[in-house]
Amino acid sequence: MSHRPGHEILTSVKAIVTVMPKPSVLDPQGAATAEAMKHLGLEETGRVRVGKSIEIELSGDANEDKLHEIARDLLSNPVIEDYRLEIVK
């Protein structure tokens, strides 16, 4: 069976999924963090966005497409969030 580059079947994989609010979505937690930073004396604080980072370790027949499916359908809300997938090993 041939595979496209970047879509190899992996026997064990560790990946980090970073989920962030889309730029067009209000981020009240980011705004509150920016305001708190100003109270700490960081007056020149720019825009702050708050997201989450999820580390996944899978064994068995995992592939990059499956990891994207997990990130898109389980770990993020594609209506209001973007995700980035980084395969670590």
PLM feature segments, named:
Residues 1-89:
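Non-catalytic terminal accessory/regulatory regions of metabolic enzymes
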